[in-house]
Amino acid sequence: MCGILATLLADGDGHCVGDLVDGMTVLQHRGQDAAGFTTASTSQDWEKVTFKTVKGTGMVREVFADPKRAQELLGNVGIAHVRYPTAGGSGLDDVQPFYANFPCGLALAHNGNLTNSERLRKELVSRHRHLNTTSDSEALLNVFAEHLAANLEARRRGSVGHAGDPLSTPVSPDTLFDAVERTMRRCVGGYAVVVLVHNVGV
């Protein structure tokens, strides 16, 4: 049992970190082991946007004991996670949100368990995907990244006169939702997920 949250402020110049911290404090009963937050801004040129992440072990108030940590999380869109470890390790490396940079910036927070995580991990490693943790959440993120990359490549090839790699192809709702559907078919179990997608949102 973990807690996850996503927020998007209509004001592109706003900062959602306060809402995320408040929300995760309310959800603290769902996980007291660790907390993590990732934010971005939709007001900037998306090519210049970077994800900002703060993670730590302990309660939300302990992660943000130093007020400067909250100042690192600029942006009007974000996701957050409080952990109650049921799968994977319990160290700092296992604190969510997890991040992948291909085919675009992706940050994921997940609650639940994948019953086929070992099989997924073996499939991912056989395709030269590097996994840093034993968390089923990281496997889920990489499965989603694979499907999104495949969809972007198929879209790029189908676009007349559209040259370049998958990174030059914008993520459309169709490519995104199809990747979600394919991911959910492959990842067996009971779970909820929020994903921050670069150049798209939550």
Predicted feature locations:
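Conserved short alpha-helical segments that host acidic/polar catalytic motifs at enzyme active sites
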Residues: M1-V202
